[in-house]
UniProtKB/Swiss-Prot annotation:
GO molecular function: rRNA binding; structural constituent of ribosome; tRNA binding
Keyword Ribosomal protein annotated: yes
Protein name as annotated: Small ribosomal subunit protein uS13
Similarity comment: Belongs to the universal ribosomal protein uS13 family.
Subunit comment: Part of the 30S ribosomal subunit. Forms a loose heterodimer with protein S19. Forms two bridges to the 50S subunit in the 70S ribosome.
Annotated stretches, region: Disordered: 95-123
Amino acid sequence: MARIAGVDLPREKRVEVGLTYIYGIGLPTAQKILARTGVNPETRIRDLSEEEVNRLREVIDKEIKVEGDLRREVSLNIKRLMEIGCYRGLRHRRGLPVRGQRTKTNARTRKGPIKTVGAKRKK
């Protein structure tokens, strides 16, 4: 099992798909990495040579922000928005949708389970 950026990549997957298991690398980024390193995207991870794995590791470490660093940057960005008191920061603080979605109905993912208030009782 190849280990890149602290993530064990699944042996049976194609390299192109396997790289997407790393937080911060999607399919387009994975394709760019493979083009830059000269690794065939159709190759299975189990079939990669040690040299190919090292080339992938080198490009990812030097040029792309992934895993812990990226998570830290995102959380610091959100914290900064909350500190400066902008609209997006207030929405984050209140646990509401940030990007203009409706909240009269829906938005349950962000707001959490329904809190029923004043339900009528049967007499």
